[in-house]
Amino acid sequence: EESPNHHSALYRSEMTEEWSCEDAVAAHVAAGFPVGRLVLGIPFYGHGTNEAPELLDYRHIIVLDSLQSCWDSAAQVPYMINSQGHVVVNYENAQSIAFKCQFLHQKGMLGAMYWDYDSDDEKGTLRHAVYQGVMNP
């Protein structure tokens, strides 16, 4: 099975789908939508392969002890690989959210939203990252 592509990459990389967040914002602005009215959506779930469910909540991703967390520095998002080095899950973490919030402030966007509350861990790691990133640029 093919490795899953990043579903919410901030920027393009070899592992992104057709669109990155940057591409989506640029397309909306090019179509005449005011950047100051745009809100960046941040998923609190990941996409997996046959070794993990296709959709996996962040709270379930962080307990996958058999996988190693990695970072795509071009796309600015994390992913997990198995012992053979194959990508198993693409997802968001506090670091990727911080980069997205920096981006939305640099672009002059209205803010961020996430989907969904219940997918976060018990500590609210991702919710707190969104709050800090949006409210404390």
Which residue stretches match the model-derived regions?
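A short, acidic, flexible beta-alpha connecting loop/helix-capping segment that sits on the rim
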Residues: D116-K123
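Substrate-binding surface in catalytic domains of secreted glycosidases
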Residues: E1-D65
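Non-catalytic positions within long, well-ordered alpha-helices that form the structural scaffold/packing
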Residues: V29, H105-G108
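Hydrophobic faces of well-ordered beta-strands that scaffold small-molecule active sites
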Residues: L38-I42, L110-W115
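Glycan-binding loop/region signatures in secreted carbohydrate-active enzymes
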Residues: R37-F103, K123, H128-P137
